[in-house]
Amino acid sequence: YFYWLYMDYVTNAYGNALDVTSSNGVTLGRLLALDAEGYCIQYHVIDQQAEANNVTLTEDDQAVLDEQLQSDIESSVGEDGTEEEFYEYLAERFVTPELYDFVNRIVVLYPRIFMSLYGENGENVTDGEALAFAEEYNFVTAKHILFRTSDNSGEALSDEEKAAKRSEAQAVLDELNAVPEAERAALFDELMKDKSEDPGLTVYPNGYCYEGGAGVMVSEFDDAVLSLQPGEISGIVESSSGYHIIMREEVTPEDYVMLGTSQPYTLRYAAAVADFDSVF
């Protein structure tokens, strides 16, 4: 089924391209077959793990599957279509009723297996496991106070306005350097809350945890963070975003990680997802 699905998509989009050969000498048809094989293995591993961990469908899950079946019937053979007509439609696409049920059941079980292994938010991942994941992928955590050099529409400020922003940044840096080192972290947090113009502060109030050196942040910011030790504060760092004063932090399992989603997740959860993906 998976092979047919891929083949149907490719031929509809690009015509008969299955014999096209990649640079390593493998035809597109062979690549599609390998992808299909991978999906088959993945689905059966999930099924085995569900059985091994006693993960079963709930009544709510079954209700979701029943709704999915009805929706698929209506979208495939019409609002007045029957299950029999729907299964005839599937048969033309190399799908048996058993395969249809199996695939949909696995889709519903997938997140339940994750929760059984790691907890809903990765809480079963230990601190040591989360920090080992951070070390393996070079995660770093940093806060910054940003003075933007563009307006809300993205238009660059004038040279005079930029100079004023830099002077403001210098005044804040001087204030930080004027207090004993033991007091700087607390003062940094106060000044970040009062002075920073970073729109991401509301989502990441305790700093950004990200994969250092991977292009997640602008290079000037990233280079500055990687040059600091935890607890150290940078000088004024200029980037396309503006002027930054950066403080590197110790990485903790509860740091919010930048995963390219609108929803922030903890490092602990990110470690769980990475481990889960490596298995499945």
Kindly give the residue locations of the regions a language model identified.
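Peptidyl-prolyl cis-trans isomerase
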Residues: 171-220, 250, 254-257
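Short, well-structured beta-strand/strand-turn elements
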Residues: 56-61, 124-127, 199-202
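Surface-exposed intrinsically disordered loops and tails
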Residues: 10-11, 15-20, 213-219, 226
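N-terminal targeting/tethering segments
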Residues: 1-95
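Surface-exposed patches in mature extracellular/periplasmic domains of secreted proteins
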Residues: 52-62, 183-194, 234-237
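Short amphipathic alpha-helical segments that mediate assembly, nucleic-acid/protein binding
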Residues: 83-86, 130, 169, 184
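Second-shell loop/turn segments in exported
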Residues: 23-37, 46-56, 71, 95-100, ...
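PPIase-associated folding chaperone regions across multiple families
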Residues: 85-164, 216-280
